[in-house]
Amino acid sequence: MRIERVDDTTVKLFITYSDIEARGFSREDLWSNRKRGEEFFWSMMDEINEEEDFVVEGPLWIQVHAFEKGVEVTISKSKNEDAMNMSDDDTNHQFDDQVNELLAQTLEGEESLEDLFEQRKQQKKNHQDKQQRRAHKPSNVRNIIVKFDDLEQVIDYAYHNNQNTDEFEDLLYMIDNKYYYSIHFDDSVSQEMINDSYSQLLEFAYPTDKTNIYLNDYAKIIMSHNVTSQVRKYFTDTNE
């Protein structure tokens, strides 16, 4: 478990699922067994207190983010002086309630993550019989996503493509220093035109198995709506 002290009232921790299991708990215990869930989070708080002298007192605010390999939890103590009037029993009861809410939120995140991983698994399976990535053309889809390795590739595409931007809505995402360009075509656009647009994109970018669900959850939206026009507005052509 990795613990980060943000400030006097806030700590952040990340614990992998393998670490959770090494402590004698399973994911099923946490999501479905209230008592085991409370036991696990209290043990985490004891460990945080030992390492960071972070004593649980008064109201707490807990945020959780579920990822593929583990869970990130942010815990903040109230700065309100009224918290000093709370008894230990009140504090423990309040913390238990928030732990239960935390587990419910994380369970929802787990379910959506499982759906996401299943989608990505299915996508990879569908691509196994393709001879070349760049030879692949979308079939009967109205949304395509490609990956740019760096900003220069994005700028190059913005200045040298000849696609009609009135025919689609687009978004530019960034995650892990990579750029992902998502285009959703109007119903009036034929599949042949979509395939042609995809081929043009692959002259500057690369295919990707990232989905809109994944990008919306984990990536940052850099630009939206006529992305190429915005890129040309803020950047000069690197090939000039």
Curated annotation (Swiss-Prot):
Q: Return the Basic and acidic residues bias intervals.
A: 119-132
Which GO molecular function entries does the Swiss-Prot or TrEMBL record give? Answer: protein-macromolecule adaptor activity
Q: Where is this region: Disordered?
A: 119-138
The record's listing under InterPro entries reads: MecA_C_sf, Neg-reg_MecA
Protein family: Belongs to the MecA family.
Task: Give the quaternary structure.
Answer: Homodimer.
Q: What does this protein do?
A: Enables the recognition and targeting of unfolded and aggregated proteins to the ClpC protease or to other proteins involved in proteolysis.
Q: What is known of its domains?
A: The N-terminal domain probably binds unfolded/aggregated proteins; the C-terminal domain interacts with ClpC.
This protein is called Adapter protein MecA
Question: What species was this sequence derived from?
Answer: Staphylococcus epidermidis (strain ATCC 35984 / DSM 28319 / BCRC 17069 / CCUG 31568 / BM 3577 / RP62A)
- Taxonomy-wise, where does this protein's organism fall, top ranks first? Bacteria, Bacillati, Bacillota, Bacilli, Bacillales
